[in-house]
């Protein structure tokens, strides 16, 4: 009976911790919770068998992602033909897949405890966690949503280490603190004290580095840039009867832009209500607007190349269309169907599934105001792709997106929360234009200085600092993710042939 009650208590604590950790992300932003929310899982993994630890980790990870990704249910409810009892299925399946990686970390901690020691397992826990995040962000096209470090996007002093090690550097510090606290529960006091001491040094270094970077003067060169947020409801965006009303909203907003004297005007993803290059009259209107405002227009539109549709950003000046970038990283089950021959039937289930062709290369526009790159929609949540633009010479980055599919849920806010890390990783300003929000200006220190909120129609202009230096992350990329993968592989492989002690419990 006692074992049963212990199991119930463990389940309650683990699942409560997972639920609370999900609330660290927008909109609740309880950003302190990840500093301790993994303690129950890590501690339990050191006293349970690898199989049991995996199951507990998978269950807690699945709950974490189910809570975090609950906003996706809105999209399925409004824009799909999936019967309501089944519309939670896609979210739960995705959560269950992502939860596997949490289970893998718990399994590895238990395995290393059994083969070596709990002290070593907890010391390696930050590497195990980052390796799992790296794999989740790369395998099968990658899904890095919910990376633990993103929970700290408002704690600007903490996230400055992203310049050195990316968002995974912040995840590493968070898990190190959790592992040290778990050590206080399961280790002898000398071992626990050593772990706390090492983690204290790591945390102090993180905060000290952040303080130094935040005290530095901003880049000397800046340029005024305007964001337009038209706030067109998704059902109306492609409605032919609404096209003229949409354009009326656009050009009414543009009349407010001329007084701002910007160097660049940024519109959202697929802002053009028609296929732009097939609509010479619309191209001419934007060309004339660029001439009137005295600044280029960066405009999102669907385009057709050799009979295939693409998601494109066009640069329009008084000379017409002078540049383009075609989106490279397409959204699975949004812009294409993976394994189309097998899963193609899902196209009939949802309005939001398109069949687009991916672009082939990153493009850096020459400006004005300076060389800049564009990531479209969720391309910016992939650090490797974002880095390509900066390495190719971009000193300013633009994100154009259309998060209207997610309504007034937490989805658009969670999407925004990832971009402060891209800014810090490369010390580059980010100009983010979203159809229905959240549009924002983000400084090279990751501070969101101005924003237009969800479904707020308007324009805003800000003097945007231009990148002045290359960072370690720009030069080396996600070295910590690769190092963590190597450490994890070596640790598990190195213990594979050792005999597992019988002392580790099986339940």
Q: What are the language-model segments listed below?
A:
Residues 212-476, 480:
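Soluble catalytic domains of enzymes that build or remodel membrane lipids, polysaccharides, and related
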Residues 1-214, 407-408, 419-422, 434-436, ...:
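Membrane-embedded alpha-helical bundles of multi-pass enzymes
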């Amino acid at each position: 009976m006692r074992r049963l009650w212990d199991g119930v208590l463990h389940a309650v604590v683990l699942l409560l911790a997972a639920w609370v950790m999900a609330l660290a992300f927008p909109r609740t932003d309880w950003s302190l919770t990840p500093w301790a929310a993994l303690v129950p899982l890590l501690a339990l993994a050191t006293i349970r068998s690898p199989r049991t630890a995996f199951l507990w980790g998978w269950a807690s990870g699945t709950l974490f992602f189910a809570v975090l990704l609950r906003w996706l249910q809105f999209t399925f409810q409004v824009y799909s033909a999936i019967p309501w009892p089944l519309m939670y299925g896609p979210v739960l399946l995705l959560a269950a897949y992502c939860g596997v990686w949490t289970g893998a970390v718990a399994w590895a901690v238990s395995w290393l405890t059994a083969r070596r020691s709990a002290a070593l397992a907890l010391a390696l826990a930050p590497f195990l966690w980052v390796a799992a995040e790296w794999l989740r962000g790369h395998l099968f096209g990658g899904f890095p949503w919910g990376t633990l470090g993103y929970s700290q996007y408002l704690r600007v002093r903490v996230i400055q280490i992203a310049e050195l090690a990316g968002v995974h550097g912040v995840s590493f510090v968070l898990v190190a603190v959790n592992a040290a606290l778990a050590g206080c529960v399961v280790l002898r006091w000398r071992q626990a004290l050593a772990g706390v001491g090492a983690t204290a040094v790591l945390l102090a270094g993180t905060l000290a580095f952040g303080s130094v970077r935040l005290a530095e003067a901003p880049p000397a060169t800046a340029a005024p840039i305007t964001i337009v947020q038209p706030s067109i409801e998704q059902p109306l965006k492609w409605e032919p009867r609404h096209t003229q009303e949409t354009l009326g909203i656009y050009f009414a907003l543009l009349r407010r832009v001329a007084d701002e004297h910007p160097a660049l005007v940024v519109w959202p993803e697929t802002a053009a209500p028609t296929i732009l290059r097939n609509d010479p009259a619309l191209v001419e209107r934007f060309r004339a607007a660029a001439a009137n405002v005295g600044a280029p227009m960066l405009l999102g539109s669907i385009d057709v190349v050799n009979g295939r549709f693409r998601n494109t950003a066009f640069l329009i000046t008084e000379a017409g269309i002078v540049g383009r970038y075609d989106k490279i990283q397409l959204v699975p089950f949004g812009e294409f169907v993976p394994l189309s021959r097998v899963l193609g039937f899902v196209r009939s289930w949802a309005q939001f599934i398109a069949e687009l062709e991916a672009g082939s290369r990153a493009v850096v526009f020459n400006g004005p105001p300076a060389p800049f790159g564009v990531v479209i929609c969720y391309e910016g949540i992939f650090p490797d792709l974002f880095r390509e633009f900066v390495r190719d010479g971009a000193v300013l980055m633009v994100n154009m997106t259309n998060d209207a599919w997610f309504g007034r849920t937490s989805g658009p806010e969670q999407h925004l929360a990832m971009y402060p890390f891209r800014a810090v990783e490369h010390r580059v300003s980010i100009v983010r234009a979203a159809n229905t929000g959240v549009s924002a200006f983000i400084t090279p220190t990751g501070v969101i200085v101005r924003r237009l909120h969800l479904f707020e129609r308007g324009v805003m202009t800000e003097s945007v600092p231009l990148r002045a230096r290359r960072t370690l992350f720009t030069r080396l990329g996600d070295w910590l993710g690769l190092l963590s993968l190597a450490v994890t592989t070596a640790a598990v492989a190195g213990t594979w042939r050792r005999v597992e002690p019988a002392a580790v419990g099986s339940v």
